[in-house]
Swiss-Prot record:
Residue ranges of the TM segments: none
Subunit structure: Forms a complex with importin subunit beta-1. The whole complex, most stable and composed of importin alpha and importin beta, is referred to as PTAC or pore targeting complex.
Phylogenetic placement of the source organism: Eukaryota, Viridiplantae, Streptophyta, Embryophyta, Tracheophyta
Organism: Oryza sativa subsp. japonica
Domain IBB positions: 1-58
Protein name: Importin subunit alpha-1b
Keywords: Cytoplasm, Protein transport, Repeat, Transport
A Gene Ontology BP annotation from the UniProt entry: NLS-bearing protein import into nucleus
Length: 534
């Protein structure tokens, strides 16, 4: 799809539900691209349980047989009534001991008995312990236990939320105890990570500002990691949070992306990717926060866990207007994108890089020229020819968009780089949208060939000949019988415009040609079955 504002673009958008900003001619990311988020690291980002086991104990637990584990757990569960009784005690020392036992039970590595603990009815007691400002150690143990309960299913989290924990945890972000503050940060991260509804409840309870106060130069690394992760959960999810509520996070994120810690960098970049995913005013706010120079540096980060969200954020920004896209070019992101295309990166990264480039080539002629000058076209064509289908699709958009907005010379350059053959090859792919994208790219190329012919460069459209030589003509013919009306109509139009005129004398008038064309037939009387070009 050429993505220029036009009536056809409107038809395509309604037919295929493509997320296209018709005014700016750029593609928003579609839901089927979220597979880049499906790494285990990202799966675990929503909620985290604090296990608290020292390394040696954790190793021993991992090595122990399953039966031994379940037997030991059963023994502990048999002790629950006594633990419940102890939690209800009026003796602070007994309360602490019992709460610590519950915390340890909820911290076991495999299948912690969250439901069983909830069913004992101790959650309201833990909530009460959160408010014991005179006893920070008890607050800490209760907060840890509730954090792990909230790390379970949505129903588990709901129990914590409906017990009134959220405003208390927000208040604990101002506790004089660093351990209590950090545990409150973690608990709120688990609640916010459960669902957009829970996230909005935390934000409405005033969770953002006291969270941002934890992100200071005196914070220890574990606090920075937890607070950045929680902040990313505050920004995450669809429907998105109210942007004005989370916009203050940008200045903190601008500092956090200069961290040398990979975990902090990863979560800070994911937060930026969520905040930049949307309308141009959101994109502008991200640009104005000053994150861009560092974001481009992070496109070269050796860790994929940092690189992916940094790339995602850059990709979001080029869905904006031409000026916002220019910001990406001006900060020298194109050489980094070239590196992502040519180095040995995984499929999801190459796909995302091609998607980003496709939105740059949907820009103005100067932006298309910047992509050409960065020597990106040749590797893009190589991917279009040889990569996995998911990457080919994005590369096809990138090339087709360049043919749509490019000058004649730019389009001639694309042809010289070998784009015709791979575009022709994709005409047989099962995705009708990509067939349309390739047809439009080829049609734009044919228009330039026609203009060259009319300028006296020869008697034939040399690009029509190149498409024929690349077996594209036969493929375009076959598209006359495609189920998709738009593809069928475009194929017929292209055949009529660029191959039929030579055969005009041999063509019958009337209805005989209505079933399609078969070019190259030397008989003067062509059968009603259609014409065969070639």
């Amino acid at each position: 799809m050429s993505l220029r504002p036009s009536e056809r673009a409107e038809v395509r958008r309604s037919r295929y539900k493509v997320a296209v900003d018709a005014d700016e001619g750029r593609r928003r990311r579609e839901d089927n691209m979220v597979e880049i988020r499906k790494s285990r690291r990202e799966e675990s980002l929503l909620k985290k349980r604090r296990d608290g086991l020292p390394a040696a104990a954790a190793a021993a637990a991992a090595a122990s047989p399953l039966l031994a584990h379940s037997s030991a757990l059963q023994q502990k569960l048999e002790g629950l009534p006594a633990m419940v009784q102890a939690v209800q005690s009026d003796d602070s020392a007994v309360q602490l001991e019992a709460t610590t036992q519950f915390r340890k039970l909820l911290s076991i590595e495999r299948s912690p008995p969250i439901e069983e603990v909830i069913n004992t009815g101790v959650v309201p007691r833990f909530i009460a312990f959160l408010q014991r400002e005179d006893y920070p150690q008890l607050q800490f143990e209760a907060a840890w236990a509730l954090t792990n309960i909230a790390s379970g299913t949505s129903d588990n989290t709901k129990v914590v939320v409906e017990s009134g924990a959220v405003p208390i945890f927000v208040k604990l972000l101002s506790s004089p105890s660093e351990d209590v503050r950090e545990q409150a940060v973690w608990a709120l991260g688990n609640v916010a990570g459960d669902s957009p509804k829970c996230r909005d409840l935390v934000l409405a309870s005033g969770g953002l500002y006291p969270l941002l106060q934890q992100l200071n130069e005196h914070a220890k690394l574990s606090m920075l990691r937890n607070a950045t992760w929680t902040l990313s959960n505050f920004c995450r999810g669809k429907p998105q949070p109210n942007f004005e509520q989370v916009k203050p996070a940008l200045s903190a994120l601008q500092r956090l992306i200069h961290s040398q810690d990979e975990e902090v960098l990863t979560d800070a970049c994911w937060a930026l990717s969520y905040l930049s995913d949307g309308t141009n005013d959101k994109i502008q706010a991200v640009i104005e926060s000053g994150v861009f120079p560092r974001l481009v540096e992070l496109l070269m980060h050796p860790s994929a866990s940092v690189l992916i969200p940094a790339l995602r954020t850059v990709g979001n920004i080029v869905t904006g207007d031409d000026m916002q896209t220019q910001c990406v070019i001006d900060h020298q992101a194109l050489p980094c994108l070239l590196n992502l295309l040519t180095n040995n990166h995984k499929k999801s990264i190459k796909k995302e890089a091609c998607w980003t480039i496709s939105n740059i080539t949907a820009g103005n002629r100067e932006q298309i020229q910047a992509v050409i000058n960065a020597n990106i076209i040749a590797p893009l064509v190589h991917l279009l020819q040889t990569a996995e289908f998911d990457i080919k699709k994005e590369a096809a958009w990138a090339i087709s968009n360049a043919t749509s907005g490019g000058t004649h010379d730019q389009i001639k350059y694309l042809v010289a780089q070998g784009c015709i053959k791979p575009l022709c090859d994709l005409l047989v792919c099962p995705d009708p949208r990509i067939v349309t994208v390739c047809l439009e790219g080829l049609e734009n190329i044919l228009k330039v060939g026609e203009a060259e012919k009319n300028l006296g460069a020869g008697d034939v459209n040399s690009y029509a000949q190149m498409i024929d030589d690349a077996e594209g003509l036969e493929k375009i013919e076959n598209l006359q019988s495609h189920d998709n009306t738009e593809i069928y109509e475009k194929a017929v139009k292209m055949l009529e415009s660029y191959w039929l005129e030579e055969e005009d004398d041999a063509m019958p008038s009337g209805d005989n040609a209505q079933n399609g064309f078969n070019f190259g037939n030397q008989q003067p009387n062509v059968p009603s079955g259609g014409f065969n070009f070639g």
